[in-house]
Amino acid sequence: MLDDCEASGFINDKRYAELLVRSNIARGHGPIRIRQAIAQKGLTKDCIEAALIATDYDWFELAKAKAKAKAIKKYGVPKVTEVKGSQSRELIAKEKAKRVRFLLSQGFSYEQVIYALDYDPLEDNDD
């Protein structure tokens, strides 16, 4: 029965993997987390890699958008353009470490995280 469905095209691992990739991208997940989530569904590594390549998504910009959204959620609409004098370097370092851990937990590589945090999301007033 399942073989008939697969032969007819009703069951297609490639389409399913692409759907899962798009769904995870919409949630703001990075490629590492997406690979893990899809692998848990039982799809092969080749199928997962093909789906990730087919999306041709800019993971660096997704990481940057995720960092900005998190900063806005935490601090509100970005209006502050400089660090207050009362904040020490230690507090700034702790906050940056939190941001790094958050983005890593969302499935972004360290290189993507560094790109995303290379700017101050509280200074970016483009939106």
Swiss-Prot record:
Record keywords, A-Z: Cytoplasm
Superkingdom of source: Bacteria
A single GO cellular-component term on record: cytoplasm
InterPro entries (UniProt xref): RecX_HTH_2nd, Regulatory_RecX, WH-like_DNA-bd_sf
Subcellular location(s) per record: Cytoplasm
One Pfam family hit: RecX_HTH2
Swiss-Prot/TrEMBL GO biological process terms: regulation of DNA repair
Family per similarity comment: Belongs to the RecX family.
Function: Modulates RecA activity.
Name the UniProt record assigns to this protein: Regulatory protein RecX
Phylogenetic placement of the source organism: Bacteria, Pseudomonadati, Pseudomonadota, Gammaproteobacteria, Alteromonadales
Gene: recX
